Swiss-Prot record:
SUPFAM superfamilies to which the protein is assigned, alphabetical: Cyclin-like (SSF47954)
Modified residue annotations for N6-methyllysine: 803, 853
Provenance organism: Mus musculus
Keyword Isomerase: no
UniProt name for this protein: Retinoblastoma-associated protein
Tissue: Expressed in the cell nuclei of renal tubules, hepatocytes and skeletal muscles. Expressed in skin (at protein level).
Motif Bipartite nuclear localization signal: chain residues: 853-869
Post-translational modification: Phosphorylated. Phosphorylated by CDK6 and CDK4, and subsequently by CDK2 at Ser-561 in G1, thereby releasing E2F1 which is then able to activate cell growth. Dephosphorylated at the late M phase. Phosphorylation of threonine residues in domain C promotes interaction between the C-terminal domain C and the Pocket domain, and thereby inhibits interactions with heterodimeric E2F/DP transcription factor complexes. Dephosphorylated at Ser-788 by calcineruin upon calcium stimulation. CDK3/cyclin-C-mediated phosphorylation at Ser-800 and Ser-804 is required for G0-G1 transition. Monomethylation at Lys-803 by SMYD2 enhances phosphorylation at Ser-800 and Ser-804, and promotes cell cycle progression. Monomethylation at Lys-853 by SMYD2 promotes interaction with L3MBTL1. N-terminus is methylated by METTL11A/NTM1.
Pfam families listed in its UniProt record: DUF3452 (PF11934), RB_A (PF01858), RB_B (PF01857), Rb_C (PF08934)
Region (Domain B): 633-764
Gene from which this protein is expressed: Rb1
Chain positions covered by the region annotation Domain A: 367-573
Location of the region described as Domain in the Swiss-Prot/TrEMBL record: 764-921
Family label: Belongs to the retinoblastoma protein (RB) family.
Biological process (GO), any one: maintenance of mitotic sister chromatid cohesion
Length: 921
């Protein structure tokens, strides 16, 4: 039964506003347990006998069975949904039973028992479940099971291959009749499952689980006869196990010998070398977690190996308690645990950078474990040479500050370390405290490394060494440290390889909660972090970009976010329209926004950026510098302007994708929807408080379609939205209506969105609609290259600026390394090089122009434009002309400035026309 809330909302509205959608458009009508009536009916007369038999087999209580049958009736009655699957009633019945059991918190069966009853695999089950609108509780249960399955599947495949490399399948010695490779595999896998459940609170941590599995493998190699082992494990095991001629059966292993076996690390060192694992981390897991577990297990047979039956009985207890997957079935290659043949989890590939002079290398498939290990190894290469303490260069920067920040920085790092260690242990397991300490040390190394790179970049840009304000800013340091830790945490998890929502419990925004850091403050450091750390992998850059998107779409809009205070201050200072970015949305987002700009703005403002084009005239430069230091108006926030511009681009990109799927027959509506969408974000930003960007997008689309008489139901919008790669069902099922009250997105549209924007929406039905907002320029990838150069269409030509040509000397801007003309630097036919290379190329181009002009005219070459030399009073001109009187010199410079400005303005106008024409196309 659909909810009645939309009807009540519609009845309260006057006739003029656009009509609300009918009740059947509610996309959440079958998503929650509260929407299904539980009236006592004679279900035995309605339900099919096979359904009743299935429920009896699974021992499903009557009220769960009734709920499951109602869910089935609703699923089977929806037009188009699960088309082709309705005939497979048994599978869908099982899914409906699962939904009802989860919603009612009554699960009398395990997930594997349900699978066996309906004869389906994990992936087939979840593929069908995704097609049904379910509650958030069911979504979470499904996500948890799927993540656990993925990790177990990857680990078992890895263990199976590892055992094949360690053990001989047909050993020549007769001593191994009681101990063979299959027996060791079974014992190792079940022991690992028990250890994982005992040691780790997180079920989906792939790296620590794999390290624990290596400990299990090491332990049972020590108890295996050398005749069963391959090299190099056989050589490493002989000093422990004795001569290969020594019979193993019946050996009396004293406590002293057992202790020696525990403390011997030769085999585990070989394992770590073979799998490229960090030996210190694995040893820590071995001594702090695995040895205490194995000693508490207390099950040992005469030959030193635990009995399979005893281990299996213990695991049975854990499995029945958790009511999820029976991972022992991996040993039998059971069809319920078969993987999807096209599943990317099993065939992930690690990108390989090819030498352009060589033929393209064939990229070989990697397992998830191998991929994560490679990523960790790349991080280790960067940080192995780094220090846990500030370098001499950093200390030099600290000493140059008005207020030396060193003591506060060291104290902050120490205090945060204690907090991180505690939170990590709470999330992963108390036995993993030392692992948390190791991860934190890596994060601190990266923190100091990136900080030093940032300061070097700022020094080159501004020609100053006193960064007292920035280095004494607590939020800057917490954000930079959080970003470094996020890189480390993501490297050790699979979240770098998939969407954030399917990451581990330590995935973003976990680090923000640990450090009590606001998402908007964290966002400020992401771009600078990526630009200055050139060794970040492509996957890590994508991960940080996803973090940035997550912040822009929802996390920055939480009630306690500093974003709202910044918006209020900005509006109070400069009026309601100042949220528009300074540069047009149709132009690329270029410019070297640094951490100093973001964290000290608007307390400090570098030169005011009024254009993102790469060519600036001397007059423009002079005007920008003067306005930055002499304006009396309140300074705009660089961080706010850049944030809004990025939000607009993310918003339009998603809207464009949705319109392409739903409104291909009405392309003119996209621009109108965008105008309403952008107006809401700019002027009705309170609607974003504790809400999601996509909620405003879908409401904007529906409102414009209604007022333009386009038949587009809200449910169709939601169905298309669910197919977007970043979409989550909670976005449209659980929308804030008012304080602590949540409902579906259609209720939000009727009771909140339309009420606030009623007048504005109706304007689009009039003969004089509002002026359409400009379409943002969408770059292919904002972080594709660290310096974000601009590529000119039609050729392999890139234009990129050097550092800022100004330094601050006694409050006045003065040129340092560049003049206005030398900012135009071109690289042709090659990748991006150093600034010196750009300067040489630029000089060559200028000289070529002069030679061509001289040969064409047959006379003396024209004098080049003179470079303005504000820093040296009375210096000779660049062309070697003699010294002129001050008045004549001033007039000459003024003429040059006017000429240059005119030329650049014409060039800008032509470029703007080109951009506009491209956007219209």
């Amino acid at each position: 039964m659909p909810p009645k809330a939309p009807r009540r909302a519609a009845a309260a509205e006057p006739p003029p506003p656009p009509p609300p959608p009918p009740r059947e458009d509610d996309p959440a009508q079958d998503s929650g347990p509260e929407e299904l009536p539980l009236a006592r009916l004679e279900f035995e007369e309605i339900e099919e006998p096979e359904f009743i038999a299935l429920c009896q087999k699974l021992k499903v209580p009557d009220h769960v069975r009734e709920r499951a049958w109602l869910t089935w009736e609703k699923v089977s009655s929806v037009d188009g949904i699960l088309e082709g699957y309705i005939q497979k009633k048994k599978e869908l019945w099982g899914i409906c039973i699962f939904i009802a059991a989860v919603d009612l918190d009554e699960m009398p069966f395990t997930f594997t028992e349900l699978q066996k009853s309906i004869e389906t695999s994990v992936y087939k089950f979840f593929d069908l479940l995704k097609e049904i609108d379910t509650s958030t509780k069911v979504d979470n249960a499904m996500s948890r099971l799927l993540k656990k399955y993925n990790v177990l599947c990857a680990l078992y495949s890895k263990l199976e291959r590892t055992c094949e490399l360690i053990y001989l399948t047909q050993p020549s010695s007769a001593l191994s009749t009681e101990i063979n490779s299959m027996l060791v595999l079974k014992i190792s896998w079940i022991t690992f499952l028990l250890a994982k459940g005992e040691v780790l609170q997180m079920e989906d941590d792939l790296v620590i689980s794999f390290q624990l599995m290596l400990c299990v493998v090491d332990y049972f190699i020590k108890f295996s006869p050398p005749a069963l082992l391959r090299e190099p494990y056989k050589t490493a095991a002989i000093p422990i196990n004795g001569s290969p001629r020594t019979p193993r059966r019946g050996q009396n292993r004293s406590a002293r010998i057992a202790k020696q076996l525990e403390n011997d690390t030769r085999i585990i060192e070989v394992l770590c070398k073979e799998h490229e694992c960090n030996i210190d981390e694995v040893k820590n897991v071995y001594f702090k977690n695995f040895i205490p577990f194995i000693n508490s297990l207390g099950i040992v047979s005469s030959n030193g190996l635990p009995e399979v039956e005893s281990l299996s009985k213990r695991y049975e207890e854990v499995y029945l308690k958790n009511k999820d997957l029976d991972a022992r079935l991996f040993l039998d290659h059971d069809k319920t645990l078969q993987t999807d043949p096209i599943d990317s989890f099993e065939t992930e590939r690690t990108p390989r950078k090819n030498n352009p002079d060589e033929e393209a290398n064939v990229v070989t498939p990697h397992t998830p474990v191998r991929t994560v290990m490679n990523t960790i190894q790349q991080l280790m290469v960067i940080l192995n040479s780094a220090s846990d303490q500030p370098s001499e260069n950093l200390i030099s920067y600290f000493n140059n500050c008005t207020v030396n920040p060193k003591e506060n920085i060291l104290k902050r790092v120490k205090d945060v370390g204690h907090i991180f260690k505690e939170k990590f242990a709470n999330a992963v397991g108390q036995g993993c405290v030392d692992i948390g300490v190791q991860r934190y040390k890596l994060g601190v190394r990266l923190y100091y490394r990136v900080m030093e790179s940032m300061l070097k970049s700022e020094e080159e840009r501004l020609s100053i060494q006193n960064f007292s304000k920035l280095l004494n800013d607590n939020i800057f340091h917490m954000s930079l440290l959080a970003c470094a830790l996020e890189v480390v945490m993501a490297t050790y998890s699979r979240s770098t390889l998939q969407h954030l929502d399917s990451g581990t419990d330590l995935s973003f925004p976990w680090i923000l909660n640990v450090l009590n850091l606001k998402a908007f403050d964290f966002y400020k450091v992401i771009e600078s972090f990526i630009k200055v750390e050139a060794n970040l992998t492509r996957e890590m850059i994508k991960h940080l970009e996803r973090c940035e998107h997550r912040i822009m779409e929802s996390l920055a809009w939480l009630s306690d976010s500093p974003l709202f205070d910044l918006i209020k201050q900005s509006k109070d200072g400069e009026g309601p329209d100042n949220l528009e970015p300074a540069c047009p949305l149709s132009l690329p987002l270029q410019g070297n926004h640094t951490a100093a700009d973001m964290y000290l703005s608007p307390l400090r403002s570098p030169k005011k950026r009024t254009s993102t084009t790469r060519v600036n005239s001397a007059a423009n430069t002079e005007t920008q510098a003067a306005s930055a230091f002499h304006t009396q108006k309140p300074l705009k926030s660089t961080s706010l302007a850049l944030f809004y511009k990025k939000v607009y681009r993310l918003a339009y990109l998603r809207l464009n994708t949705l319109c392409a799927r739903l409104l291909s027959d009405h392309p003119e509506l996209e621009h109108i929807i965008w105008t309403l969408f952008q107006h809401t974000l700019q002027n009705e930003y309170e609607l974003m408080r504790d809400r999601h960007l996509d909620q405003i997008m879908m409401c904007s689309m529906y409102g414009i379609c209604k007022v333009k008489n386009i038949d587009l139901k809200f449910k169709i919008i939601v169905t298309a939205y669910k197919d977007l790669p970043h979409a989550a069902q909670e976005t449209f099922k659980r929308v804030l209506i008012r304080e602590e009250e949540f409902d579906s997105i259609i209720v939000f549209y009727n009771s909140v969105f339309m009420q606030r924007l009623k007048t504005n929406i109706l304007q689009y039905a009039s003969t004089r609609p509002p002026t359409l907002s400009p379409i943002p320029h969408i770059p292919r990838s904002p972080y594709k290259f660290s310096s974000s150069p601009l590529r000119i269409p039609g050729g392999n030509i890139y234009i990129s600026p050097l550092k800022s040509p100004y330094k601050i000397s006694e409050g006045l801007p003065t040129p340092t390394k560049m003049t206005p003309r030398s900012r135009i630097l071109v690289s042709i036919g090659e990748s991006f090089g150093t600034s010196e290379k750009f300067q040489k190329i630029n000089q060559m181009v200028c000289n070529s122009d002069r030679v061509l002009k001289r040969s064409a005219e047959g006379g003396n070459p024209p004098k080049p434009l003179k470079k303005l030399r504000f820093d040296i009073e009375g210096a000779d001109e660049a062309d070697g002309s003699k010294h002129l009187p001050a008045e004549s010199k001033f007039q000459q410079k003024l003429a040059e400035m006017t000429s240059t400005r005119t030329r650049m303005q014409k060039q800008r106008m032509n470029e703007s026309k080109d951009v506009s024409n491209k956007e219209e196309k």
